[in-house]
């Protein structure tokens, strides 16, 4: 919700949310998944906004120079094996991650799979801005058992954005 957006991003250290829009009051939101930081669960912000051609080109140029990695969802990546709706680790996805332990994690974006956007997994471009291992929120706001990533990533964060057609999806995930 737009009402909670500013409040939620204010709860995170500035460096974690620096890539997110400061406010979304005047923007039409495509979809939002905003979760107040709390323990036991993955803390995340997924924000989808419409993105016109000129804004898209500006973002592409900025991201090309700022991103630590540029991916497509079919690439060999360390994927967060997490079900956001049920707050559960998807064990089969967790096992699939083992060969990619040395890569930086990105979200799975499972809510975009199939449905209204059947070509999302083929055409979306992921710009990973940063990901680090460690504790970046107070202990009582961190997931207690990790999120199904290899042990080296028991706590950490990933942030970035996805460009897909006329949308930009911003993400931050902290565990």
Give the predicted meaning of each segment.
Residues 2-124:
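Surface-exposed acidic loop/strand-edge motifs in secreted or periplasmic proteins
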Residues 128-153:
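Short linear interaction motifs
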Residues 150-165, 172-173:
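Short, exposed beta-strand-loop hairpins at the edges of beta-sheets
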